[in-house]
């Protein structure tokens, strides 16, 4: 933890150079005694003398987590933002890593947590009228496939589609992976944009809503899809076993379908339990996406667009 109360009851930041180890400090959550620690690996921080009675803070914070919180805090302060670090939200029974203005929580997530816990924490913020942005550390970065947990970190806007945020301590940057699409075998495609942590972070976080340029990219779809599905079925892949069963119930066999029957192979990501961070209905955009491809000729090259493009195409047809 980076914040504590001093003997006068004022909140102090561990990063302040004037603090002394011999002084007495307490946890703003449980009021228990905390100690100021300095190390060669971790930045200055406070640690509980005994954690038994604290329901707010944990002692398993990594050096990455502490350093990223500190870097974000310094950047926001330098750009004149009203920001609190490790703000105790007693009505929610939780702590926001950073709280900007009156309604935005920033959560630095460097390790895995249960999907249920993520859903609970996110819903608590939403029910209290707060917005939350989860910023992912290295262990949770998106690579070739979306894990179930990563799906629960996805955000969506009409301008850049599905996206998520990452933090890179080594490069000292915040990274946006956006226009995220997923093919029928689970491979993901996306664009990447990065900013230095010294830039105006609030301007950065507004980018998904204010992006003006329509960005696109092309992907190549697989050939002989039924052969790939056959391998997946032989390997007892649960996803394809379920899809084949659904096809049988409709009197179909996936292995008898052509590549054209699977067009387009690259589509919007899906979540069987429902997306945690996305509160708006995506049904309209999904419908527009399908309508667009129903009118397209089959091709192994697929161009991926932001959701606003499909809406614009449909509007042009009616005008």
Give short role names for the model-derived ranges.
Residues 72, 96-114, 125:
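Conserved catalytic cores of phosphodiester-cleaving nucleases, focusing on short active-site segments
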Residues 103-119, 228-229, 233, 240-242:
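Short beta-strand-loop-alpha-helix junction that forms the active-site gateway
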Residues 73-92, 98-101:
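A short acidic/basic microdomain associated with nuclease active sites
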Residues 110-165:
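Catalytic cores of nucleic-acid endonucleases
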Residues 1-76:
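N-terminal cysteine/histidine-rich coordination modules
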Residues 91-93, 141-142:
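Short secondary-structure capping/turn micro-motifs that flank functional sites
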Residues 154-319:
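Non-catalytic C-terminal interaction segments of nucleic acid-processing enzymes
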Residues 85, 105-109, 134:
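Short catalytic-loop micro-motif centered on adjacent basic/acidic residues
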């Amino acid at each position: 933890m980076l914040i504590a109360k001093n003997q006068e009851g004022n909140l102090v930041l561990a990063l302040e150079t004037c603090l002394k180890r011999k002084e007495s400090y307490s946890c703003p959550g449980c009021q228990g005694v905390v100690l100021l620690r300095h190390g060669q690996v971790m930045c200055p921080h406070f640690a509980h003398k005994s954690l038994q009675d604290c329901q707010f803070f944990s002692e398993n914070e990594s050096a990455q987590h502490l350093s990223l919180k500190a870097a974000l805090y310094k950047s926001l302060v330098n750009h004149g933002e009203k920001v609190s670090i490790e703000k105790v939200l007693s009505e929610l029974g939780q702590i926001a890593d950073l709280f900007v203005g009156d309604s935005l929580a920033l959560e630095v997530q460097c390790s895995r947590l249960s999907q249920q816990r993520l859903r609970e924490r996110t819903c608590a913020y939403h029910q209290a009228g707060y917005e939350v942005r989860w910023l992912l550390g290295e262990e949770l970065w998106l690579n070739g496939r979306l894990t179930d947990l990563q799906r629960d970190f996805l955000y969506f806007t009409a301008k850049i589609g599905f996206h998520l945020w990452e933090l890179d301590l080594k490069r000292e940057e915040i990274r946006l992976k956006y226009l995220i699409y997923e093919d029928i075998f689970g491979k993901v495609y996306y664009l990447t944009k990065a900013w230095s942590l010294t830039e105006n972070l609030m301007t950065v976080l507004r980018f998904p809503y204010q992006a003006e340029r329509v960005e696109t990219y092309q992907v190549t779809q697989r050939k002989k899809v039924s052969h790939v599905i056959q391998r997946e079925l032989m390997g007892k892949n649960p996803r394809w076993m379920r899809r084949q069963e659904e096809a049988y119930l409709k009197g179909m066999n996936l292995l008898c379908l052509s590549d054209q029957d699977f067009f387009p192979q690259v589509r919007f990501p899906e979540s069987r339990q429902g997306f945690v961070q996305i509160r708006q209905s995506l049904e309209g955009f999904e419908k527009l996406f399908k309508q667009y491809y129903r009118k397209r000729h089959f091709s192994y090259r697929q161009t991926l667009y932001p959701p606003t493009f499909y809406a614009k195409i449909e509007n042009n047809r009616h005008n």
